[in-house]
Amino acid sequence: MTTQITYFATAARGFEEMLKTELEQICQAECKVTQGGVHFTTTQRGAYQALLHSRLASRILLPLVTTKIFSDLDLYATIVGINWAYIFDPRDTFFVDFNGTNREIRNTQFGAMRVKDGVVDYFERKGFTRPTVDKDHADIRIHVYLDRENMVVSLDLSGDALHMRGYREDTGKAPLRETLAAAIVLRSGWQKGTPLVDPMCGSGTLLIEAAQMQAGIAPQLHRKHWGFNAWKGHQQAVWKEVLEQAYLQQNEEIQPLFFGFDLDHRVLAKAKQNAKNAGVAHLIQWQQGDIAALKNPCPEQVGTVICNPPYGERLGTTPALIALYSVFGQRLKQQFSGWNASIFSGEPELLNCLRLRSHRQFKAKNGPLDCLQKNYQISERTAAEQQADELKFEQNAQVAPDFANRLAKNIKKIEKWAKQQGINAYRLYDADLPEYNLAVDRYDDHIVVQEYAAPKNIDEQKARQRLLDAVSATLYVTGVETNKLVLKVRQKQKGTNQYEKLANKGDYFYVTEYGAKLWVNLTDYLDTGLFLDHRLTRKMVGQMAKGKTFLNLFAYTGSATIHAALNGAKSTTTVDMSNTYLNWAEQNLELNNLPLRNNRLFQADCLQWLAECRERFELIFVDPPTFSNSKRMEDSWDVQRDHIKLMTQLKRILTTDGTIVFSNNKRGFKMDFEGLAELGLQAENISHKTLPLDFERNPQIHNCWIIRHIEN
C-alpha cells in the first residue's frame, strides 16, 4: 500500500492552487497544478482520503493510459488495447465521459461512442459477457480527455461529481454548487471558532459547508455509491480504515456560531432540512427576516458576514437589486462594525452599491457566469460617525449627487405643471447631464428609466456603473417602490423592432391625459404604448376633430383616436399593421366607453390600405415610422424619401376643406415644399406648438406639420 500513484483531481477554473494546498494537507501528496485541476502523487490510501475529504475537487481520476491519437481508428485501437478485464467485471454497467475534440474527432458524442465500442468489443473478443451502458447509475465511469492529439483515459473514482454531497434535498431558485460554496468560505477570511452570518442564506449551502469544516465532518462521509466500488483494484480494508478515521475526526463539542437569515420562509425550511441531512442542524440558527432589518446576532464578538446575494442573471430585477445592495451595505456598516464581510456576486457593479472598500477580491465561475468575490473589513465607528453616515445615506449624497439634484429640481417644476394640466404620465429627466445619458418618465405611480445607447468611445463598465448610480438616486428622489421602477436599454429603432416583445408579464394599467384614459405596459415592449412627447399633438387633434370624420394612420395604440372620439368626432378610422397594437387600441376604446360602431379598426399595411381606400376624411393624423422594412410590407419605407408619395395618396382621400396633421421623429427631417406645391398642398411647421414643457430640452424629438389644400 506504499506504492505511489499519480492521480488527477479536477476543479473549477481558478480553484487549482487552493485545491493543491488542500490535497497537500489531506494526504501529503506531491502536487503539480495544471489548468482545470491538480496532478497529485500519493498512495491508494491517500487517494481515498482525497475522495472523502476534498471540498474543492470536482472529480478524482486514476489515469490508465496517456497517449497520442490522430484519428478515430487510433482512439478505438487504444481503447481495445486496454486490459479492461483487469479493471472491472463485464457484468457491471459502465458509462463514458468524453471531453475535448480534435480535427478528426469533432464531436464528444462520437468520441464517447467510439470508446464505448472499444470497451464492448474488448470484452466480446475475450469471450466475456457484453457489458451494458448505464447513463444514470453506472458502476464504472470511464473518463477520456482529448486535447489535439493528446489523450488521457482514466477511471473516475468519484462516481457522481464530488459537489454532490448528498445533503441537499431541495434548493432555492439559484443554488451554489457545494464545491464553489466551500471555496467562497475558504477565501472569505473566516476563522474557525468565530461567528459566521449569512443574511441572504437561501438553501444554506455556505453555512452548511462552513459548519462541516468547523465540526470536522468529511464532505463525502455519507456517500453510498463510489466510482471505485466496482473497480477490481479497490482495497476495501484500506477504505474502511480511512472511513473510520474520518468518523473519529469529527468534533462535536463546538459552539453554534452560525446564523442564517432569509426573507423566504419556504427556502429557510429547505435550508433547515439540508443542515439536518449534513449533520450540522444543531450548529446553525435560522431566522426569517428582511435585509433592511438585519441585526448582528453576536454584537459582543467579531466575526464574518458571508453572502451570495441575488444578481441580475439569477433573480430579481436591476432596480430592486440596486436598492437591495445599497441597504445591505448600510446595514453592514450600522450593525457589523469591526467585522469582516465577503460578498460573492455575478455583477461587480452591484458590489459597488455596497459603498464599501474591499481589500481583496477573487474571480470565479458560477456555471457560465463570470463572478467576483470581494472581501471587506468594516471599520469600527463611533456612535457619532454612524449617525453621520446614516444622514449621508438618507441624503443619498454618495450616489450620483449631480443627477439626483437635477432630477429633484425637475420634479419640483414638472409635477406642479402636470397636475395643472390634468396628466399623470410625463418626462422628468431627458439626458440633462451628458454623463447620465438616460431618460426618466413617470407613469402614474410607476417610473421608467430608459438608458440611451452609449457612444462606442464610452467605457461600457463606466456607463453601466453610472446607470446603476442613476437608478439608485432615482429610487431615493422619487420615493417609488422598487417593484414599480422599470429599467430599459433604449437603442436606435431599426425597422419594426419597436414591435418586438421583450417580456410576457401582461402588466397593464391606465394613465390619464386631458380626460382620456390610456392603457400602458411598461415591461413587455420596447415602448410603453404611449409616446409622451406627442401629448399636445393628441390634444390638438382632439380639439380639431369635433364633428369631423377622422383617420388615424400608423395609429400605434390609437391614443390620438381616443382624443378625437372623446372630443366629438363624427366617426374615427384607425389603421395599423400590428395586430397587437390594434387590439390595444380596441382596449383603449372600451376603457373610455367608446362604441366600435362609430370607431372602426383596420389591421393592414397602412400604405396598401391607403392605396385601396375610397372614403374621404376631413381630418387625418399620420405619424409614420422613420424607417421600416417589415416583411409584411410590400416595399421598404423611409419617411424622408417617401413622404411625398404618402401625401399624394392622402390628398386623394382628403376633403377640400380637410386637414392633415403629419408628424415624424426623424431628426433633421426636411419637408419637400416644392413636391407638396406640385400636389396643390401647403405645409405649416407647428413643431414648437406641439412640444410640451417636459420635452422642451429636446426640441428635435419630433417635428409636426399642418398640411392643407392650397387656397385658389
Swiss-Prot record:
GO terms for cellular component: cytoplasm. Pfam families: Methyltrans_SAM, RlmL_1st, THUMP, UPF0020. PROSITE patterns: THUMP, UPF0020. It is an enzyme of class 2 (transferase). The keyword Cytoplasm applies. It comes from Actinobacillus pleuropneumoniae serotype 5b (strain L20). Its main location: cytoplasm. Specifically methylates the guanine in position 2445 (m2G2445) and the guanine in position 2069 (m7G2069) of 23S rRNA. Belongs to the methyltransferase superfamily. RlmKL family. The keyword Zinc does not apply. This is Ribosomal RNA large subunit methyltransferase K/L. Keywords: Cytoplasm, Methyltransferase, RNA-binding, rRNA processing, S-adenosyl-L-methionine, Transferase. Residues 46-157 form the THUMP domain. It is found in: Cytoplasm.
